[in-house]
């Protein structure tokens, strides 16, 4: 069920209790955070991928606590004292745990309590007490204190992935000392529902923090979003102490003008902007700036400026894909007005990703990460369609379902080579981004599936109505 990593002589086993949402994102987040703190996670949990239990080998409890101060995908971490697929195997595992590692938590002058956690099965209070009583083989000498215990122990049981088919006995049993909880409360405290400035496509708070963790954002980093929108991705990075900036082609969005997104509010208020969002959370000191600028035409000095690039490019579904330009050549004269507003053209998804990769290869520091969303039409998806660049290495690829036929993938890339002029056009390689060629290519596929589903539903309703008519007519004839 839980899959351990490779063992080491100086390492202890720790048990992670993972959240049961965004399952594909969990282990890549843990792996990224461990690499940030100098740890390693060598084996991924391929078997039973939805299990909330994951065994890690860590060099110290301090690293486990650091991990919990960042992760939003893990609920808790425990020092693992034993585990097994049967009670006898479990008991033997706990008894073989070094006694010297236990004794400081079993002293007569200490207090403790044991909590039962069952995955996908509800236990009665009587059943929980019976399970606690089975732990008498551990030499607890302290006093039980259910309100304010010094040491908290957990007995965790895995009853499989289907709550409707839970067996009588668990597939696996774990016992350990609770160390720390993760940062799941950030999802609620930074909820978009409570945010001052939002838009139609503001990123979910939980996914924003996952992206920041995949990017290994740390204090004093400079994080950039070339398609910043309402700045949801900047908020999570600023929470972790990074300085944030971005660009956005829509003047009204950057300056908080125009129609409001919220129900019962017609126009945006005078203080609705990205800076106000950071101010709301006490993070304004990390705000560098957001420019009205075209992501396809970088305005930056040619140098590695950013420690991470975190972005959600427009797909053409609820936000249009645009860039500045014109179909015809315009000769600028001395009389050319300074206040001229450039014409905006369609910006193909294939060009968006090509430009994004070219930008990241040049402006990311070596070792910096690019984290972005890639929309996917599932019947056509293979790993070969992923954009590539010789300066960037694929770290993780996680899927979030949007509908039966579409999804989006959170792609994490790391810059492993210094940019050279010979890489300037590497992103234009033959065959790259073919599924994204043409304006609104993903939008057309997205809505083609929607139309088919709507047509099926209409046919079903029509057939049902016809059946009812035939039935009522038969009754009249009788």
Swiss-Prot record:
Residues 457-478 are annotated as: Disordered. Signal peptide: none annotated. It is an enzyme of class 2 (transferase). The keyword tRNA processing applies. It catalyses: guanosine(10) in tRNA + S-adenosyl-L-methionine = N(2)-methylguanosine(10) in tRNA + S-adenosyl-L-homocysteine + H(+). The keyword Amino-acid biosynthesis does not apply. One of its GO terms (cellular component) is cytoplasm. Keywords: Cytoplasm, Methyltransferase, RNA-binding, S-adenosyl-L-methionine, Transferase, tRNA processing, tRNA-binding. Pfam families: UPF0020. GO terms for biological process: methylation; tRNA processing. Its EC number is 2.1.1.214. InterPro entries: DNA_methylase_N6_adenine_CS, RlmKL-like_Mtase, SAM-dependent_MTases_sf, tRNA_mtfrase_TRM11. It is found in: Cytoplasm. GO terms for molecular function: methyltransferase activity; tRNA (guanine(10)-N2)-methyltransferase activity; tRNA binding. It comes from the Eukaryota. Belongs to the class I-like SAM-binding methyltransferase superfamily. TRM11 methyltransferase family. Catalytic subunit of the TRMT11-TRM112 methyltransferase complex, that specifically mediates the S-adenosyl-L-methionine-dependent N(2)-methylation of guanosine nucleotide at position 10 (m2G10) in tRNAs. This is one of the major tRNA (guanine-N(2))-methyltransferases. Part of the heterodimeric TRMT11-TRM112 methyltransferase complex; this complex forms an active tRNA methyltransferase, where TRMT112 acts as an activator of the catalytic subunit TRMT11. This is tRNA (guanine(10)-N(2))-methyltransferase TRMT11. It comes from Xenopus laevis (African clawed frog).
């Amino acid at each position: 069920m839980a899959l351990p990593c490779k063992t080491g002589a100086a390492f202890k086993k720790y048990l992670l209790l993972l959240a049961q949402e965004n399952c594909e994102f969990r282990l890549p987040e843990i792996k990224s955070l461990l690499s940030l703190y100098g740890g390693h996670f060598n084996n991924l949990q391929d078997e039973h991928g939805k299990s909330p239990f994951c065994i890690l080998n860590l060099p110290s409890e301090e690293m486990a606590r650091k991990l919990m101060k960042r992760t939003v995908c893990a609920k808790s971490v425990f020092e693992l004292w034993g585990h097994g697929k049967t009670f006898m195997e479990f008991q033997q595992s706990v008894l073989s745990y070094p006694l010297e590692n236990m004794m400081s938590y079993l002293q007569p002058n200490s207090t403790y309590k044991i909590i039962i956690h069952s995955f996908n099965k509800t236990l009665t209070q009587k059943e929980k007490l019976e399970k606690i009583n089975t732990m008498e083989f551990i030499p607890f000498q302290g006093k039980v204190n259910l309100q304010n215990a010094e040491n908290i122990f957990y007995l965790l049981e895995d009853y499989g992935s289907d709550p409707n088919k839970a067996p009588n006995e668990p597939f696996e049993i774990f016992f350990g000392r609770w160390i720390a909880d993760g940062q799941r409360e950030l999802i609620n405290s930074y909820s978009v529902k409570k945010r001052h400035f939002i838009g139609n496509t503001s990123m979910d708070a939980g996914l924003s923090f996952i992206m920041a963790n995949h990017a290994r954002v740390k204090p004093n980093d400079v994080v950039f979003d070339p398609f910043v929108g309402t700045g949801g991705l900047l908020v999570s990075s600023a929470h972790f102490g990074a300085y944030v900036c971005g660009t956005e082609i829509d003047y009204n969005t950057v300056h908080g003008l125009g129609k409001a997104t919220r129900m019962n509010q017609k126009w945006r208020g005078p203080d609705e902007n990205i800076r106000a969002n950071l101010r709301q959370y006490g993070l304004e000191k990390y705000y560098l700036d957001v420019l009205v600028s075209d992501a396809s035409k970088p305005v930056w000095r040619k140098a590695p400026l950013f420690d991470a690039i975190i972005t959600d490019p427009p797909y053409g579904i609820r936000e249009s894909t645009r860039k500045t330009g014109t179909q015809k050549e315009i000769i600028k004269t001395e009389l050319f007005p300074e206040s001229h507003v450039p014409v905006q053209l369609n910006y193909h998804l294939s060009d968006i990703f090509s430009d994004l990769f070219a930008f990241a290869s040049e402006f990311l520091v070596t070792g910096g990460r690019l984290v972005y969303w890639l929309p996917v039409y599932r019947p056509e998806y293979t790993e070969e369609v992923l954009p590539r660049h010789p300066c960037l290495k694929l770290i993780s690829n996680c899927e979030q379902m949007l509908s039966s036929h579409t999804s989006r993938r959170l792609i994490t890339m790391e810059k492993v080579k210094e940019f050279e002029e010979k890489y300037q056009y590497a992103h234009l390689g033959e065959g790259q981004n073919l599924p994204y060629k043409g304006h609104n290519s993903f939008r057309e596929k997205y809505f083609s599936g929607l139309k088919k589903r709507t047509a099926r539903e209409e046919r079903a309703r029509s057939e049902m109505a016809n059946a009812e008519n035939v039935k009522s007519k038969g009754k009249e004839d009788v």
